[in-house]
């Protein structure tokens, strides 16, 4: 991909003002939102789990709306212990919070119970604190099998997507073609057996002898799993609306990210759900009118796992160094992540789609050793046309020339900073430049992996 180090004019990249946040008649919903949403604004792995873990201390309920075990959230408790979560919401480390897995999630029960087991081994109380939607779709080992077979076919044509092979796409495919099984189906054994047998027959018909799935074994296994999951299962739509009416505070944890969204991402190199704001509404049954605060989480640089266009990608030793410093390996797959500069065009696009009110800028400390830092502020076509947003056409996106601004680095260790004033002037300038370019305030800045490694940026005086 061609790039040019060109300085942009402020006028060219001026961003719209952030939308105002609704205030209730009695209190500021900005300072104390009843419903707050945390979403990824890049290609995933932005550090959403850490912010959710921090904010969860202030909320009664933490809910997941979409995705499955392809989402990997890494968080640390106050003692520095590491927790890698895939299905259980990150709020589980707050003993006062109830965690909800909504109807939009595709749920692999063996994986869920393994995650619960690991949490209990570390002393985390889960029973009575985790609720699962009766409308959530089930993800079976057959979906994982199909995922691997599909990727193998695509690899033969050189068109593999680079999925996590966790069965997410096939599970959502079953949902869309209306032959999927939901959690509520677990409790009618005859119906469950018939539906799963039919689903397995479809897989065998499609892939023939390559499809190695023990349907009878899974039917027997799920008889036991049905009883294990029963205490967790509720009508989460009714539960959440009752909580809303009673004044409880709800934190919604997005999985994956907007640039992987099925509709708005770099299709077909995307996930199979909607990690944007629309997926929150359909994945939980809470209307958009109830959202008081929408936080967009973005790394101070960018990463991506798997194939697909990536305009600001960095190659060579610099990418290797940043990957090593940032520990950029997938929580779910362990694959090395691709590394890139901050992409303002993509970030502004994601903020527009989601109605983002605040930004959490993460992993600023990873850039500590750089003399200069580049920020992608514009896309230019081969014909010299400046693009206002992320183009839908992949050929166009793959061949854009990125317009960069170059900012000075700070070359200092910022991991001990806990206040805005403790950050070097160049680090402050970098954060402020990003804020100015997207027109949305940066509220939190991550300066390390620990729970407390977070700087709150003071609000700018109102004009």
From Swiss-Prot:
Any matching Pfam family: Adenylsucc_synt
Pathway: Purine metabolism; AMP biosynthesis via de novo pathway; AMP from IMP: step 1/2
Residues the record lists as binding substrate: 331-337
Free-text comment on the cofactor: Binds 1 Mg(2+) ion per subunit.
Entry EC no(s): 6.3.4.4
GO BP, sorted A to Z: 'de novo' AMP biosynthetic process
Gene3D superfamilies: Adenylosuccinate Synthetase, subunit A, domain 1, Adenylosuccinate Synthetase, subunit A, domain 2, Adenylosuccinate Synthetase, subunit A, domain 3
Top EC class, one word: ligase
UniProt KW keywords: Chloroplast, GTP-binding, Ligase, Magnesium, Metal-binding, Nucleotide-binding, Plastid, Purine biosynthesis
Sequence similarity: Belongs to the adenylosuccinate synthetase family.
Anything else known: This protein may be expected to contain an N-terminal transit peptide but none has been predicted.
Name of this protein: Adenylosuccinate synthetase, chloroplastic
Species of origin: Chlamydomonas reinhardtii (Chlamydomonas smithii)
